[in-house]
Amino acid sequence: MNTLIGKTGIVVRNIQRAELDSIDALGRLGVATVHEAQNRKGLLSSKMRPIQQGTSLAGSAVTVLVAPGDNWMFHVAVEQCRPGDVLVVSPSSPCTDGYFGDLLATSLQARGVRALIVDAGVRDTQTLRDMGFAVWARAINAQGTVKETLGSVNLPVICGGQLINPGDIVVADDDGVVVVRRDECESTLVAAAERAGLEEEKRLRLAAGELGLDIYKMRERLEAKGLRYVDNIEDLEG
């Protein structure tokens, strides 16, 4: 499938999606937990930032390749979206123009799309926040775009430095964005839920006053690294 990266003039109408209940569960677990649960893979660039705060979600990726400074394929992609999807967009060459604003967001909301992940710029951000339409973007930029050059819809793209296939699960929150392969959805969900349970146990122990030094059995390793304790700074003199 990677040989399809960068191809243009193609729209794939039918893609496979994971079960919505599993997607929603990944969204509740959050980016950090999911990223750790899949051995720290799939995390998009830290430059992909939310324009809003307090939103955590997941959805099936509808992928879009656009030309620099050209948002034509956004409009093409809207037709291919279903409720629960997340639109994932990448330019064929780096560009931070404002590809997306409130009108396209209105169209996507009408299709039940949950969010936009775009490796480029967006604008109308205050209106987008007022609408409750979630966006993670590389830039905020009022510079507009044209509608002239073909791209693709539902072919693999590289977004935020990660390969994203149509139908992969995208999890996004205040910490960033992580991608989960569609065929790894269930196994990742099991691992992430287990990790969340263990973290809750540790949280309760920490709240009760236990030290991370003891919970994580750090003392012997610290000693082996050469860490030593002295009662007073004067003990180091002479």
Curated annotation (Swiss-Prot):
Alphabetical list of CDD domains matching this protein: RraA_family
Binding sites annotated in the UniProt record for Mg(2+): D124
Domain of life (superkingdom): Bacteria
EC number, UniProt record: 4.1.3.17, 4.1.1.112
An example molecular function term from Gene Ontology annotations: oxaloacetate decarboxylase activity
Keywords tagged on the record: Lyase, Magnesium, Metal-binding
Cofactor(s) it depends on: Mg(2+)
Binding of substrate, residues: G101, D102, L103, L104, R123
Record-linked InterPro entries: LigK_PcmE, RraA/RraA-like, RraA/RraA-like_sf
Pfam families assigned: RraA-like
Presence of the UniProt keyword Lipoprotein in the record: no
Gene3D superfamilies documented for this protein: Ribonuclease E inhibitor RraA/RraA-like
Outcome (variant: R123A): Abolishes catalytic activity
Class of the enzyme per the UniProt entry, highest EC level: lyase
Catalysed reactions, semicolon-separated: 4-hydroxy-4-methyl-2-oxoglutarate = 2 pyruvate; 2-hydroxy-4-oxobutane-1,2,4-tricarboxylate = oxaloacetate + pyruvate; oxaloacetate + H(+) = pyruvate + CO2
NCBIfam families recorded: ligK_PcmE, PRK09262.1
Function: Catalyzes the last step of the bacterial protocatechuate 4,5-cleavage pathway. The preferred substrates of the enzyme are 2-keto-4-hydroxy acids with a 4-carboxylate substitution. Catalyzes the conversion of 4-hydroxy-4-methyl-2-oxoglutarate (HMG) to pyruvate. Also catalyzes the conversion of 4-carboxy-4-hydroxy-2-oxoadipic acid (CHA) to pyruvate and oxaloacetate.
Family (UniProt): Belongs to the LigK/PcmE family.
SUBUNIT field: Homohexamer.
Protein name: 4-hydroxy-4-methyl-2-oxoglutarate aldolase/4-carboxy-4-hydroxy-2-oxoadipate aldolase
Organism from which the protein derives: Pseudomonas putida (strain ATCC 700007 / DSM 6899 / JCM 31910 / BCRC 17059 / LMG 24140 / F1)
Lineage: Bacteria, Pseudomonadati, Pseudomonadota, Gammaproteobacteria, Pseudomonadales
